[in-house]
Curated annotation (Swiss-Prot):
Keywords: Early protein, Host nucleus, Phosphoprotein, Virion. One of its GO terms (cellular component) is viral tegument. Residues 326-335 have a biased composition (Basic residues). This is Early phosphoprotein p84. Needed for efficient replication. Recruits the DNA polymerase processivity factor to pre-replication foci. Residues 166-301, 317-336, 357-393, 407-452, 569-657 are annotated as: Disordered. Belongs to the herpesviridae U79/UL112 family. A motif (Nuclear localization signal) lies at residues 261-264. Isoforms 1, 2, 3 and 4 interacts with themselves and with each other via their shared N-terminal regions; these interactions are important to both their intranuclear targeting and the recruitment of UL44 to subnuclear sites for viral replication. Its main location: host cell. Residues 201-220, 285-296, 598-608 have a biased composition (Gly residues).
């Protein structure tokens, strides 16, 4: 049969409450005190109830929580007590122990002293209202056996006070059994959660929450202690996880910088290994027909898409010569004819076929004197070059001459003659055929830094193109300045150039003599000045309509050593037949003759005296006038420029752009200046 249950319910409502004290000692202890104008109590026991009104009074609530707020349990254990006074007397005294939850507006505690008793106490303070609710369930015989309510105050509150005292005494009497049951449940939950966390996250999972409320102070304390000792707060464990380093760096034990260095050294070892070749060596080896093990010399891949590819430190000619030492010559010869390598000077490639060069040591022609002389050897002393490959041969000769003059002039003279097959087995590097270098057939030489062979080759090709093609179309030898000879051609010659060319043709075995290529100048030389010298003449046809020269940006640089040497040779050659100054052409006056530097169309002799008189008479010596004077002095000292000025002074434009770094020059003067500079470079 079911035992009768008693249910006590109390509802307090306060009018015009005002909080006068709120003291929060820490997160687990809070005290609040209110004053009110009047209060109303609704007291119900089972099916009976009554209402009680109180006047002014105050209410004090104390909330205590055991353990830390972050212990991990769903509800913290603690207690809450509420004392109410009215009309100067104590009207109510409520106390409940159990699981507690509180915040700024709501405070509630639920307690259970055993299987036959439970209680709830809640206080709500929100929007100017204050309410207190108290509910308790217990057995009738349980309450009657614990004693009457004689010690209580008023009759209306006797049952509540007795119930509260009975709840406390019952909790102390029946506490051990309930605490043991709750402790076992919590231990089982902790065991299960510990197994789950260790299996899923390796002992780093989130801590579980110990649920369930228990009566008695010792039970609540034990649950909080076990939660703190066995399982930590999940937020703290996650924070420790974030501070750990990533597993990759933790396993390797090396920082990212050390790993990057390790990758770099590994790549270097693979590139210089005995059996492997990197990508650049494979590309250069495929172009030269080579193979085999990896070489120590690194050659950059040639790329024609780059306009400044000739500035690379390595040229494919060295890679070709080194690969030819390790292989048979006939195999390399086949690859050299069929493959066309990229030009290192950025120029497009022209395939070179066999039979273009015919060897004839005894024959020499004026067309061979138009290019720079090749290195003197038994096989290549003189070669007849077709007109289509004149520029390519001149560029190749300049390249080889530069290498011989720099490295070993003595060894170049004593080099043994090479076979025809080895001479022809060269890979076209640019638009020219490069003869084999005997110096690289020996032990591999250390890399030279940097090489300017490709730059010299490009400059030589530019000079040859300007000399062979462009000057033939320019109206520099027009009938406006020079009288035509029979047949409409003009004989243009220079005595010093002819002497140098004759000396080159008669040179023996030894260091190659370097000579400036014969220049097509604009001066008129009488036929008597070249008596006893092999004639080196060029028949130039003059077009009908003379166009104006092209404006080009060019630095004005003349080597004084070349100027003095050329001036000495010019003075010795012109002693027999001096050059008569031509009459000034009509309309040849300069447009801007500021300091009377070149008044009228005067020649180079009277310009210096007029400049000195103008410089002494002028009061202001500005920087512009000094620059112009220096320029004219350099022109007077240079025989090539003086010769061109004698014949072409009238073709000069009036404005001088030397202050701005610009100057309008004729292509013939440009070729003369560049040739003089290159000749001085070879002489040094």
């Amino acid at each position: 049969m079911d035992l009768p249950t008693t249910v006590v319910r109390k509802y307090w409502t306060f009018t015009n409450p005002n909080r006068i004290l709120h003291q929060s000692v820490n997160q687990t202890f809070d005290v609040r005190q209110f004053v009110f104008d009047n209060a109303r109590l609704v007291n119900c026991v089972d099916g009976d109830g009554k209402v009680l009104h109180l006047n002014k009074g105050w209410l004090c609530a104390t909330i205590m929580q055991h353990g830390e707020a972050s212990a991990g349990a769903k509800t913290q254990q603690g207690f809450m007590s509420i004392d109410i006074t009215g009309d100067g007397e104590l009207q109510e005294h409520l106390f409940v122990r159990g699981g507690i939850v509180f915040n700024k507006s709501v405070s509630s505690v639920v307690g259970s002293s055993g299987p036959n008793e439970s209680a709830l106490l809640t206080m709500i303070s929100e929007n100017g209202n204050l309410q207190v609710t108290y509910v308790r369930h217990y057995l009738k015989n349980h309450g009657e056996s614990s004693g009457g309510g004689g010690g209580c105050g008023a009759a209306s509150t006797a049952s509540a006070v007795c119930v509260s005292s009975l709840g406390g005494s019952g909790g102390t009497r029946d506490g051990p059994s309930a605490e043991e049951q709750q402790r076992r449940r919590q231990e089982q939950r902790h065991e299960e959660r510990r197994k789950k966390s260790s299996s899923s996250a390796g002992g780093g999972g989130g801590g579980g929450a110990s649920g369930g409320g228990g009566g008695g102070g010792s039970g609540g304390q034990h649950s909080s202690d076990s939660a703190n000792g066995l399982l930590r707060d999940p937020r703290l464990m996650n924070r420790q996880k974030e501070r750990r380093p990533p597993p990759s760096s933790e396993n390797d034990g090396s920082p990212p910088l050390r790993e990057a260095k390790r990758q770099k050294t590994t790549a270097q070892h693979e590139g210089h290994g005995g059996g492997g070749k990197n990508e650049t060596e494979q590309q250069s080896g495929g172009a030269g027909g080579g193979g085999g093990g990896g070489s120590g010399r690194m050659s950059l891949p040639l790329d024609t898409s780059e306009a400044v590819a000739f500035l690379n430190y390595s040229s494919s000619s060295s890679a070709v010569s080194s690969s030819s030492n390790n292989h048979h010559h006939h195999h390399h010869h086949h690859n050299a004819v069929t493959d066309v390598a990229a030009g290192t000077d950025g120029a497009l490639l022209l395939p070179i076929e066999r039979g273009a060069v015919v060897s004839s040591p005894s024959s020499t022609s004026p067309s061979s004197l138009l290019s720079l002389p090749r290195p003197s050897s038994a096989h290549s002393a003189g070669e007849t070059v077709q007109e289509s490959e004149a520029a390519a041969t001149a560029a190749a000769a300049g390249l080889m001459m530069m290498r011989r003059m720099r490295r070993a002039p003595a060894e170049a003279a004593e080099a043994p003659p090479q076979s025809e097959e080895e001479n022809d087995s060269t890979t076209p590097v640019s638009n020219c055929r490069v003869p084999p270098n005997s110096q690289e057939s020996a032990a591999p030489q250390p890399p030279r830094s940097p090489r300017f062979d490709d730059i010299i080759q490009s400059l030589t090709k530019m000079l040859n193109d300007c000399k062979e093609k462009r000057l033939c179309d320019l109206p520099l030898v027009s009938s406006r300045l020079l009288p035509e000879t029979s047949g409409g051609t003009v004989v243009v010659n220079h005595s010093s150039v002819a002497r140098t060319a004759a000396a080159v043709s008669t040179a023996g075995v030894g260091p190659p003599a370097v000579a400036c290529p014969p220049l097509v100048t604009t001066g008129v030389v009488p036929s008597g000045s070249v008596a006893g010298v092999a004639p080196v003449a060029a028949a130039v046809e003059t077009p009908a309509a003379p166009p104006r020269p092209v404006c080009e940006i060019k630095p004005y640089v003349v080597n004084p050593v070349v100027a003095t040497a050329a001036a000495a040779s010019n003075s010795s050659s012109s002693s027999s037949a001096p050059l008569p100054p031509p009459p000034p052409p009509p309309g040849g006056r300069r447009g801007r003759a500021r300091n009377n530097t070149r008044g009228g169309g005067g020649g180079g002799g009277g310009g210096r005296n007029s400049r000195r008189q103008a410089a002494s008479s002028s009061s202001s010596s500005s920087r512009r006038s000094r620059r112009r004077n220096n320029r004219h002095e350099d022109e007077d000292n240079d025989p090539l420029l003086r010769l061109s000025q004698v014949a072409g002074s009238g073709r000069r434009r009036g404005p001088s752009f030397l202050e701005d770094g610009l100057e309008i020059i004729d292509p013939s003067e440009e070729a003369a200046i560049a040739a003089a500079s290159i000749a001085a470079f070879f002489d040094d």
